[in-house]
Design a protein with these regions (language model features):
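Alpha/beta hydrolase fold serine-hydrolase catalytic domain that processes acyl esters and thioesters
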Residues: 1-24, 28-117, 121-164, 185-394
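Gly/Ala-rich beta-loop-alpha elbow adjacent to hydrolase catalytic centers
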Residues: 168-173, 177
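Short glycine-enriched nucleophile-adjacent loop
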Residues: 177-186
Length: 394
């Protein structure tokens, strides 16, 4: 089946007027926002300085890492050569990182037509502070990136008082898009036509119950792959469109480049996989059974083990030169105060026990274990066959 790249080939010569902008077009620009435009698009909420997409593509840094992949580079090249995308304007780029308040935030605005804009919030990057901020959402109603998203969206909408807006994000970016729209004043929200959330975690119940969210909810288009893990976190009351992914496993399916497409729509399924549903049940039960203070201490301690060892990003962990840091991380764990170590071990065990209970309740084995069992069964069968052949030969 097709992916987003096949769709882009299909619409190469179609303008936005020939074929209306849809969920796949929004996804393409949402993924594009992961690229580093720091020295390409002027930074600020209301710069009003535009850069054409095809021009920006020529200046993009071609270095790949955990976040920016070869597929992202292929994406920017394909968009730059496609009629409906190449003349889109990029503006109001913001990329902020503040370890003191534990904030990772990035956003950019796309001018699609004269008065139609798409505001995209970037998902979590490779910084541990960014990942830590994500887990803060399990015990904080509002995190710094969410508040920043709300101010960014309001500033952009005020800059273009006659504009109509789409708002979108993948992963944490979808969470920020929903949050920012929830806290828009009514006179601004009236100009938001749709909110696109791609495999994004939900919000805390305190936010879900606000009038702002109840007003916003009907405008949310929530897409998750069948094995979704990230998109099942926290409270996600609106029904999701379940997209078929060609990838194996929930975390790999988080990569939207693996999502299947037919014509100009996602290939959809009726329900998420048992693994996804079990993980959803596990995380929600673990949150119910632990206090906000316990979760705060757990994640502060867990991420502290890495940060104290000088590991500040996922790319640091992937760097072979930093393998010596692993020993330091384990040493940091051994050096924890006995109370901290007991808390870390207890909550980790509780999370694991909750997952095991979910397996028992569903009377299913996680797919990864089934695959491993099948592999070893086949391996043993091949070895047995080889032994018989050798014996027959003798």
């Amino acid at each position: 089946m097709s992916t987003i790249f096949d769709y882009l080939k299909e619409v190469t010569y179609d303008s936005i007027y020939d074929r209306p902008f849809n969920e796949l077009d929004v996804l393409a620009l949402t993924e594009l926002t992961y690229l580093p435009f720091d020295r390409i698009v002027p930074q600020g909420d209301t710069t009003n300085i535009e850069v054409r997409l095809s021009d920006a593509a020529e200046l993009v840094d071609r270095t790949t890492d955990f976040i920016v992949t070869d597929q992202h580079l292929q994406l920017v090249d394909d968009l730059a050569s496609t009629k409906r995308f190449k003349n889109i304007k990029l503006l109001n780029y913001v990329n902020e990182y503040d370890p003191d308040i534990q904030k990772q935030f990035a956003a950019m605005t796309y001018r699609l037509t004269m008065d139609v804009y798409l505001v995209v919030f970037r998902g979590t990057d490779d910084t541990l502070i960014g990942w830590k901020e994500d887990f803060h959402m399990t015990y904080m109603d509002h995190v710094p990136a969410q508040r920043r998203a709300a101010s960014y969206l309001q500033n952009v909408m005020k800059e273009f008082p006659k504009g109509r807006f789409l708002v979108a994000g993948h992963s944490k970016g979808g969470n920020l898009a929903t949050y920012a729209c929830t806290y828009l004043p009514n006179h601004l929200f009236e100009r938001v036509d749709a909110i696109y959330s791609y495999d994004a975690p939900g919000l805390n119940r305190a936010i879900i119950e606000t009038e702002g969210y109840q007003r916003t909810s009907p405008n949310i288009l929530h897409f998750v792959p069948q094995g979704s893990i990230v998109g099942m976190m926290l409270e996600v009351p609106e029904p999701a469109t379940i997209v078929k992914s060609r990838a194996f496993g929930g975390f790999v399916q988080h990569d939207a480049f693996t999502w299947m497409i037919e014509k100009d729509k996602f290939v959809t399924l009726d329900q998420t996989s048992p693994d996804s549903q079990q993980t959803d049940e596990t995380l929600k039960q673990w949150v119910r059974e632990t206090s906000a203070d316990e979760r705060k201490k757990f994640f502060d301690t867990f991420f502290g083990l890495f940060l104290d060892a000088g590991i500040t990003s996922i790319n640091d962990l992937r760097n072979l030169k930093n393998f010596s840091k692993i020993k330091e991380i384990f040493q940091n764990a051994q050096d924890l105060d006995p109370t901290e170590r007991e808390m870390l071990e207890r909550l980790a065990k509780q999370l694991l026990d909750t997952r095991v209970q979910a397996w028992k309740k569903w009377q299913t084995v996680p797919r990864i274990l089934v695959q491993m069992a099948t592999f070893f069964k086949r391996k043993n069968a091949v070895e047995s066959s080889s032994a018989l052949l050798l014996e027959h030969k003798d």
